[in-house]
Swiss-Prot record:
Organism field: Nitrosococcus oceani (strain ATCC 19707 / BCRC 17464 / JCM 30415 / NCIMB 11848 / C-107)
Pfam families named in the record: GatB_N (PF02934), GatB_Yqey (PF02637)
Family: Belongs to the GatB/GatE family. GatB subfamily.
One annotated GO biological process: glutaminyl-tRNAGln biosynthesis via transamidation
Protein's name in the database: Aspartyl/glutamyl-tRNA(Asn/Gln) amidotransferase subunit B
Function: Allows the formation of correctly charged Asn-tRNA(Asn) or Gln-tRNA(Gln) through the transamidation of misacylated Asp-tRNA(Asn) or Glu-tRNA(Gln) in organisms which lack either or both of asparaginyl-tRNA or glutaminyl-tRNA synthetases. The reaction takes place in the presence of glutamine and ATP through an activated phospho-Asp-tRNA(Asn) or phospho-Glu-tRNA(Gln).
NAD among keywords: no
Enzyme Commission numbers on file: 6.3.5.-
Alphabetized InterPro entries for the sequence: Asn/Gln-tRNA_amidoTrfase_suB/E (IPR017959), Asn/Gln-tRNA_Trfase_suB/E_cat (IPR006075), Asn/Gln_amidotransferase (IPR018027), Asn/Gln_tRNA_amidoTrase-B-like (IPR003789), GatB (IPR004413), GatB_C_1 (IPR042114), GatB_Yqey_C_2 (IPR023168), Gln-tRNA_amidoTrfase_suB_CS (IPR017958)
Gene name of the encoded protein: gatB
Amino acid sequence: MQWEPVIGLEIHAQLATKSKIFSGAATAYGAPPNTQACAVDLGLPGVLPVLNQAVVRMAVKFGLAIEAKIAKHSVFARKNYFYPDLPKGYQISQYELPIVADGHVIIELEDGVEKRIEIVRAHLEEDAGKSLHEDFHGMTGIDLNRAGTPLLEIVSGPDLRSTKEAVTYMKKIHTLVRYLGICDGNMQEGSFRCDANISIRPQGQETLGTRTELKNINSFRFVERALQYEIERQTEVLESGGQVLQETRLFDPAKNETRPMRTKEEATDYRYFPDPDLLPLVLEDSFIDEVRETLPELPDAKRKRFVMEYALSAYDASVLTASRELADYYEAVVKTADGEAKLSANWVMGDLAGALNKEGKSIADSPVSPEQLGQLIKRIADETISGKIAKTVFETMYAQGGKADEIIARQGLKQVTDTASIEKLIDEVLAANPQQVTQYQGGKDKLFGFFVGQVMKTSKGKANPQQLNELLKKKLS
């Protein structure tokens, strides 16, 4: 029997605010334990939460970007459960009336086919604290710095049908929240993580199978591995006549397996009710319009524009718009390079990306500015230097800094374009290799490349390749 996986993701994006969702405590990552938790975060008697307006703006911004309905009236609720790192005994979230509903994104599959993924809702909530196990023996430490950190939980429909689709969708949301500037997307720090709901059913059947939830997966690779393991596990259970249990499971990357955590709860288990300390959130049209004005050019629109405006391939445009920082860098290079779009794309995706990857750096950390790279590309385009020499200039620029023109002048790298000078170089090479000249004129055409190489070697790579080819052909004819 052929089985079909049915997958939905609940992505938790930590919103990039300086203070928490209901208190003024800081949200900076890496502070010593329990130094960024105030009385509100600790749930001490007599304190009242106050909603951070920046959080609301970010949620609305996301909703507009996915063409969703923005609720003008939404409500915060208490989600009641006991856990050591939840000091109040409840989590403030949104349940029946979320701030964002009925949106969608379009993902592109490997075969180029586009697929629409529904986003059922996106709601605001506070994060819990963190349990620490590594530095303790026989006990668990609690760090409440993260308690009260604002989260946007983004819930997809059960629209994903493979591990690849799930990862593609997750990357799409990751790119989007970073473009919008509402989340830094740092998965190592837990700023962007997901829970995955997965069931399998016979191919062609509409009824959903029993689902399991995989908790707190914080890398694209782990999402793919966890889902693949769970598909295989559920398939084995059903084909052996067993029954899949509705439960919450944890993915163990070291063992590459999922293991049970607890029986999956239903919403009723959390006893949701409106938080009496928080008024309903009411948004005016003017507020939503104000947020709409701050929307940047979104990834899909930017990618299409790059194809049309810069005549790039769909692949190149996709790579260059993978992050807002990279797209901005590329456009600044093109501007400096007087519109040399394709050549700029080749250098940004090739030599620059290679150098950055080698050192584990991002485009934001590039020691070569877009203006420096753009000037170098101008010198290739106007044939001041050859592409080969440009690599030498780039290496110097990357390691030591400096402008392309200064490096070219200092190292004497300007391309030889004077016809007489190139002819002199050719004559020297031909005179030094009479046997090869005779063989070439006798029909051994492959020796042409040998002569080109010898002239380039003699000129230290500075002879203009096009002129060299033309003059050499005349000399050998």
